């Protein structure tokens, strides 16, 4: 067993003509879509030819590809592994788009990959390291589509007009949600050409969003893959829905990281089901969200954002790096919240702090109790 990095070493000698795209290839491409292609890969409206892996490798701004601090080392290894493999070294890419609008609370990015066997994969980037991108995951709880979802449909239809072949579509995290949303809401002539739709630990949808779209038409082509302790992928997802649960070498929210998913040969290592404790938390959070009206959801998401933003961190890495400082700011920001909202946000924030490690998480719980006791004594 290994990870997608080991997969590139062990399976990289096979071309796509010899072995067609599989679930692991999909995750490789979705993670590759996180690279910062700005100024290197042509944009969706530039009418320029696709660029090759060799072009990326010789570009003067190559180092900017790895600007995402969270995954700089692993993304560099991914890139090197792809470049050295027969499977991905011939990859070409085009139609890159990257939009970040803090005021509109939206972050949208996508790129189209052209494979050696003539197949095409449209990949939507997931939540990046910004707090704004993370908030958009929770904005999916609204009954109306978010700006990123609307853009995902437009991008799909624009990109699909440039080639005639059937194609794959997918994404990790929020990108998985965008891929499914675009597939069920695009024009019928585009929808008919989609082979498989991959959602790698992507959030689900409110029932109203599914009903407005043509989800039933694409349901048989959707492949949803989640780690066995999924939080993000089970947001607005029913445990009765069809999804594949896979093993991860990590724990908690850290399992959202694609580099922790275990691979055996050309497929993920299957797990029996989601962990019981996580399943209970997922169900509790979803039931609570779905019980709220639009105004209450706005209040909850804004409160969650305000609590996390109180740390003055711009990225999740900043938020978890100095967890003691963040925790103090977060607890102060809890003043004024009603008990039920505060309790639910506390669970989510503790899950975020899993990124800081088990020792930090225990310290956070202890600190939370201390701060809570201090607050009671002052009253």
Map each language-model feature to its residues:
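Gly/Ala-rich beta-loop-alpha elbow adjacent to hydrolase catalytic centers
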Residues: 170-175, 179
